[in-house]
Amino acid sequence: MTAKSKTSTSEGAPGAVWFRPEKQSRTKPLLTQDKIVSAAVELLDRDGVRQLSMRKLADRLQAHATSLYWHVSTKDDVLDLALDAVFGEVRLPVESGPSWRDDIIAFMAELRRVLLDHPWAAALASTRPLAGPNALARSEFVYAALAAAGFGRADVLAAGAAVSNYVIGSVSAESVWRHQDEAGTRSALAEHLRAREADYPALAGNFPADGGDWQAHFDRGAQYLVAGMAATAGLE
């Protein structure tokens, strides 16, 4: 991108990095945006979003903090770029599967796998526009699969959002549970519900004190979602 894009996005806002012109250098820099992003993902995987700072990132790269600002303007730039790098890990099929349902469910499973590998990514994805090239390519895959299946424009938009929101939301919840004392918290909550069974009979009777099977719960929910999408769009 060589000319500045016309956009109402604030220069320092999440997502602004995608609409800002790239800086051109006459010499080959020792520090590159790819190196910055790779280091950022490593730090985010280790410490999470709150602990990431430009200074820590510079230390990781053995560089001066000011040298980062040639490539990125803010921490939000770094987060946007790192998140899009994670979306780039989501593998897309070379060929379509037996049906659009298979393609969508396979995509959801693959997106879940990648987001669980980077526990910070799902929660971050819900806070900013996913406008990077990798995220857009994955959205294009979903939209194209739905359109080819016969979904109308309004249904493509709604179903596409449902797919991403289901995966991002479920992974966000799973990541929170897994990065605390899940067994202890579930046991305490189960006891709390049993003591108040008159107030919460359905919860007390169905809450999985042992945590259940996250993968099985996700897969079952994905089947419900896709079946509902098909029924709503009249494609059963």
Curated annotation (Swiss-Prot):
Keywords for the protein's UniProt record, in alphabetical order: DNA-binding, Repressor, Transcription, Transcription regulation
Residue ranges constituting the HTH tetR-type domain according to the UniProt record: 30-90
GO terms assigned for molecular function: DNA-binding transcription factor activity; transcription cis-regulatory region binding
Chain segments annotated as transmembrane: none
Keyword Transcription in record: yes
InterPro entries, A to Z: DNA-bd_HTH_TetR-type_CS, Homeodomain-like_sf, HTH-type_TetR-like_transc_reg, HTH_TetR, Repressor_TetR_C, Tet_transcr_reg_TetR, Tet_transcr_reg_TetR-rel_C_sf
PANTHER family: HTH-TYPE TRANSCRIPTIONAL REGULATOR RUTR, TRANSCRIPTIONAL REGULATORY PROTEIN
Function, as annotated: Transcriptional regulator that inhibits erythromycin production. Directly represses the expression of SACE_5813, eryAI (encoding polyketide synthase I) and ermE (encoding rRNA methyltransferase), suggesting its direct regulation of the erythromycin biosynthesis gene cluster. May play an important role in regulating secondary metabolism in actinomycetes.
Protein name in UniProt: HTH-type transcriptional regulator SACE_5812
Organism for this UniProt entry: Saccharopolyspora erythraea (strain ATCC 11635 / DSM 40517 / JCM 4748 / NBRC 13426 / NCIMB 8594 / NRRL 2338)
